[in-house]
Every structure is written in structure tokens, then in C-alpha cells.
């Protein structure tokens, strides 16, 4: 973080498991070529092996937008709800998200602390003559979300993975039909998900403190799991209002690994993991993971 402070690495928390489709899912891809009788709206596929996958950007974006609905931040000592204050769209198609204006706000924001924020220099300098020319700075995300790849059990050449669903829009005035074809993944298809949360002691200025960020860690892990539960009731991908994209998350691992683990000083068996458990069961492991990671960061690595 340079002149804005210091980030001291303490460990990682791993979220691993399966995303199981309960209904057909559509995450749109691009049409590389026009074909007579081709699908109007194909799904996204890996260009190397032509297998479908769930992009990390799609899952992370859904997690972030979900947390923006109930997350909060501390500003000037007061708790406040979040506003959609940053446009990430185009001039013609505006898309607004929440994004804190500077590092100080991002550190105290439940959304930006997990998913990151790009500083807004104009807002940061507004009304501060002595800060003219200062940069707000970026706050890198603590959570990394990988692409969810197809489960090996579904990779048999004869296995049918998708269907083409024909949908019809009807003009309310003329009653003319407008059919379209949508490709979607079949129910019960499974993908392997992995997310990694970086546990860091973040100090904005001066020497890094040795205080373990227990409160923020518990809040962040709980918020991530809460978002996953909400996604189970809402869905992932397009057309969720028409029944697409209902999913279930099944954990195979929810574990914490300290810096000592990466240095080879602790046994692998000390990680907190299990197989085939629900989000609620994962939530019960939060305190156990925090205790595993909670130690004096004497040998921590800072940037």
C-alpha cells in the first residue's frame, strides 16, 4: 500500500466445493460465427476444450451485488447503508455499483474490503485544499474467485450437458410471436468452485500493528456465506426471473491456513476441512478457523 500504509499477510481462508444446478442455467457467451439455424443465445464455453464453465467474474459479481443490498460501512464514526455511486458502464448503457472513494472508507466498508475498490481522486480531493494532487489510491480485493470448471464426472464424451430451449415473446398489440432459442445447462450438472480470502492486518499509516483483525475476519466470512445462501434462493446467470439458474452450494472444504503453514512449519492435518457439508455447517466453523489463524504475527510478511 506504499505511503498509504501497510498490509501484513497472516494467512488464507479457502472455500471449496461444488455448485450443483437445480434448474437450467444460462451464462451467455459470444457467437464466434453465424450459422443457419444456430442458437440465438449460446452459453459461455472454454475456447480450448469447448466445455462450459462458470466464470469467476460472474460468481464474484453476483456475490458483490448481493452484499451491496445489505452491507454497510463506517464513515466519520457513523454506520451507513451503501449507495450505488460509481458507473462502470458505457455512455449509452449506464451500470452503477458501490465503490468507496478512498482507502480509509474501503477498509471500513463490508463490500469494498472484500471485493476491492478503485479510488476516486476527484471525490478524495473535494474540499481539501491541502490534498490537491493527492491520490485516493486503490484497495485491492481480499477475496479471489476462480472460474468454476466442470466436475470430472460430467466430462464423458457421451454425456449431454446442454439443451436448447425455445422461448416465445408475444407482441401485446398484434399478438405476433417472436420465437428465440436459448442454450442452457441441464439441471444436476456440477461445477467445482474455489474462492480464497486473504487474511491481512491492514494499517493505513505508520508502522503495522500486531493486532489480529478478528472482528473484520468474522464479519467478512459470515457475509460471504450469507451471500452464498441468498444466491441459492435467487440464482446465477441470466433469466433467473423465468426459473433459470437455481443452484446449491455443497462444501468439500472450508479451511484456514496460517503463514506458518505456507512456510512448512505446521502439519497439513491442522487445517479445518471436511467433506460434503452445507453453508450453515460451514458457518459453524468460522470461530474454529479464526482461532487457528489467530496468533501473534511476528513473522508476517508485509508489502
Where are these regions (language model features)?
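RNA-binding basic/glycine-rich loop and surface signature characteristic of RAMP-family CRISPR effectors
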Residues: 1-166, 170, 174-303
